[in-house]
Amino acid sequence: MKRWKGAALLLLCTVVLLRLLQGLAQPEKENAHVPVLGIVTTAAEDDRREAQSEALVHAAEEHGFKVLEMPVERTQEAQIEAVRALIVYQVEAIAFTPLVESGWDNVLREAKSASVPLLSIDRAIRGVDDVPLQHIGFDYASLAEQAADALLQQRMPRDGVLELYGTVNASDAREIARGCREALEEQGLTVTYSLCGDGMRSRGCEILEEMEDHLDEIGYIFAQNDAMALGAVDYLHSHGRKPGKDVLVCAFGGGAELRALQKKGEVAVIGALDDTQLAELTADAAQQIAKAPWKPYIALADTAVLTEEGTADA
């Protein structure tokens, strides 16, 4: 199966590359070089992730890049295979959102050896000593602390806290958890239950089903992405509970579907991420690291805490 997946990926890469080269064969100016940005697009778990990918492609094209997009499944193995394929094709730079933060040492060194810089987007990776960190993301811990504060201000802390944890070993999950806990500790609270939903809507629903006997203890739900929050709201609706009244929900992301629920009063607080700015910063960074590949590069996009009452910069 692994060999089949690898062969299928290489075939896909070859087809995409041939189409790309056909486009490059007819530039407006003879022999003009069009820089190529490789983007590893991982299967999206919600509309916010889909919009993020679209914004990244659009920003890259607006900055003069030809985009070579590699869609992959939600596994680190698939991401690494795609990165390696793009290294072989000698794109100017590669942008990707790593599912987890460890396990990238070998491919980082391979990229450096081939002079193809890797830019981690949204989530961070653990660097290696001889490869500089190049990352565009968000200050998740600060956002989480402020979002949790905003949630606790809406109702006096009196109930338990359920955390719908994202992907284990992912930087965003760790930092959101840290920020939320810091805010809770200031109020003398702790996370009552923390269960891993791997960022999936179906798991958000399943976790609440597993917790049915304990839901009366829960007053707050912290969902680390849109998808799990949507799954939790789905379950609450289908079992006669009222999100926004019986349980206050805080989620991190801010896609269209989640914002629609907030307008209906069913999601109390959103830790919103500016994916448009993230995409612009990524395209800017890709231009710069293509010229100076092995210099450290870190930039953070804006975030905001959204409540029904208004918006506060995080």
Predicted feature descriptions by range:
Residues 48-65, 143-147, 171-190, 203, ...:
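Short, solvent-exposed amphipathic alpha-helices that sit
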Residues 68-90, 193-215, 229-231:
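Structural motif
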Residues 102-142, 255-263:
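Flexible loop/hinge segments that line or gate small-molecule binding clefts
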Residues 38-40, 90-98, 117-121, 162-163, ...:
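Periplasmic-binding protein-like
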Residues 36-59, 68-85, 89, 98-101, ...:
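Extracytoplasmic "Venus flytrap"
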Residues 96-112, 180, 198-259:
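Hydrophobic alpha-helical
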Residues 79, 135-161, 203-205, 254-258, ...:
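Hydrophobic alpha-helical segments within soluble ligand-binding/sensing domains
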Residues 17, 21-23, 168, 254, ...:
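Hinge/cleft segment of the Venus flytrap/periplasmic-binding protein
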